[in-house]
Design a protein with these regions (language model features):
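Catalytic domains of carbohydrate-active enzymes, especially glycoside hydrolases
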Residues: 91-116
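Active-site mouth loops of central-metabolism enzymes
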Residues: 81-94
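Active-site region of glycoside hydrolase catalytic domains
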Residues: 28-73, 122-124, 133-346, 355-460
């Protein structure tokens, strides 16, 4: 029972955190030549979460095993209820032209997607040419629409045959074979590479699904670091100008303290410390933080729909990373706001308001010398959030369970994002709609001093 409880606490604590000195801000001439854009405005998806037609994988097996069955701590650490059937997700596999067109209409110039290892390599050593052609066409469609592809190579899903051989932890060599082939295939196309999505959360998901035990967490992160370095080597061998990162989901010290005491090792510091020598840019994800009036103890998974939002803390997190890892450009790979099945939040904050406030504070960060080069909104469309369609993050909302047509319905944030990408930020004179938290503790007490909303702002373009 102790082991099971520790597993639930570990997965819940990490996943709860996820749902919920100035320098020259201008890049040098050499840096400008190395990057295709002055600023990357993006939106994001992930293969398994949106594609449909799911091939055999660790996650398909988990969902097939648990969907629709009575809730247990192992099957529902997120507090979202029974595992939903996967069905066809939102069918990006057949509707990517529509989704890319919607992204293009908002003016975004970057599109994050995943290439699913399980889809393109369904058996050891066998490549599925039809599925590779599908990804070729997705990238060609992005290029026709003037977008930079950001490709994630591991977003927690791997082939069933890898699961049969001991899971990701024991098959980094096979992952390197996959990564080498994909980075070579798309070399020279201006791709921004993300090796492994949110390594800490990846470990939590492996615990959740029974692939690893809590006492294997530190060793698992070591293997993920090995995998990241393999991607870095492969991408740079194929293209010396390649740009590679891994995206860390920022978790506040207050939240980490809740489960460090469980005996789990490897989470005390940043994952970037393990791979600092193999990063071309630093990607992080931020959703919400902690404060004296928003303590971690109140941020349970069951309350996440109404957890206080702290848009201003994206500034503190960006500053923290710029100070810890000077010299690396910083990209917000994921940021967004969750709602409960699309219902209005109890605080009445809208997706548009949270987006505007977040961008406002990124403009402030840039003006204060923090080298922000890009921002992705998570997500373009509602998707399958690891066992549930209940959490909604999409700029376009989709009723995956109730609407056979999977209609994309724009939220209020679509028009807002179009204005932001056009103008390089919020409208002149905009001031944040959300009240700042009282004494933020998101990056420790150094973020307690409130930011002045009347400070300088930079255009992000």
């Amino acid at each position: 029972m102790v082991l099971k409880w520790n597993r639930v606490l570990l997965a819940s604590a990490i996943l709860a955190a996820l749902s919920v000195t100035a320098c020259d801000a201008q890049p040098s001439a050499t840096q400008k030549a190395a990057w295709d854009r002055n600023f990357y405005w993006g939106t994001a998806t992930a293969g398994y979460q949106v594609e449909g037609d799911a091939p055999d994988s660790n996650w398909r097996r988990y969902v097939d095993r648990t969907a629709g069955k009575p809730v247990t701590p192992d099957s529902d650490p997120l507090g979202a209820g029974p595992v939903d059937p996967y069905k066809q997700a939102v069918d990006f596999r057949h509707r990517y032209h529509e989704d890319i067109a919607n992204a293009h209409a908002m003016g975004v110039n970057t599109f994050r997607l995943g290439i699913e290892w399980a889809r393109v390599m369904p058996e050891p050593g066998r490549w599925d040419e039809r599925e590779l052609a599908y990804y070729d066409d997705v990238l060609a469609t992005l290029r026709k629409n003037g977008m930079t592809p950001m490709i994630t190579l591991m977003h927690w899903v791997y082939p069933g045959w890898i699961a049969d051989r001991g899971g990701f932890m024991n098959n980094v060599g096979a992952f390197e074979e996959f990564a080498t082939a994909i980075t070579k295939r798309y070399a020279g196309q201006g791709v921004l590479w993300v090796s492994i999505n949110e390594p800490l959360a990846f470990g939590a998901m492996e615990v959740r699904t029974g692939a690893i035990k809590p006492d294997q967490f530190d060793a698992f992160l070591d293997r993920v670091a090995d995998a990241h370095r393999a991607v870095y080597r492969a991408a740079h061998a194929a293209d010396p100008d390649a740009k590679v990162t891994t995206n860390e989901a920022y978790i506040s010290p207050e939240v980490l303290a809740q489960f460090v005491g469980l005996g789990v090792k490897g989470i005390e510091g940043s994952f970037f410390d393990r791979v600092e020598d193999s990063l071309d840019y630093l990607g992080f994800d931020y959703y919400t933080g902690t404060a004296e009036d928003n303590p971690a103890s109140a941020q349970s998974m069951t309350a996440r729909w109404n957890t206080k939002l702290q848009a201003e803390d994206i500034y503190h997190v960006a500053r923290h990373y710029s100070q810890q890892y000077p010299g690396l450009p910083i990209y917000v790979v994921e940021n967004g706001m969750v709602t409960d099945n699309g219902k209005p939040r109890s605080d009445r904050v809208t997706r548009s308001q949270y987006l505007e406030d977040t961008v406002f504070w990124l403009q402030r960060a840039k003006a204060d010398g923090i080298p922000i080069i890009g921002y992705n909104y998570w997500s373009l469309v509602d998707n399958y959030e690891w066992g549930s369609y209940r959490p909604r993050f999409g700029l376009y909302t989709v009723d995956a369970l109730g609407d056979p047509g999977l209609k994309r319905v724009p939220t209020d944030a679509v028009a807002t994002y179009a204005q932001i990408t056009r103008d390089g930020g919020t409208v002149p004179g905009y001031r944040p709609a959300l009240p700042a938290a009282h004494c933020s503790t998101t990056v420790g007490k150094d973020s307690c001093e409130p930011l002045d909303p009347n400070g300088p702002l930079a255009e992000l373009k």
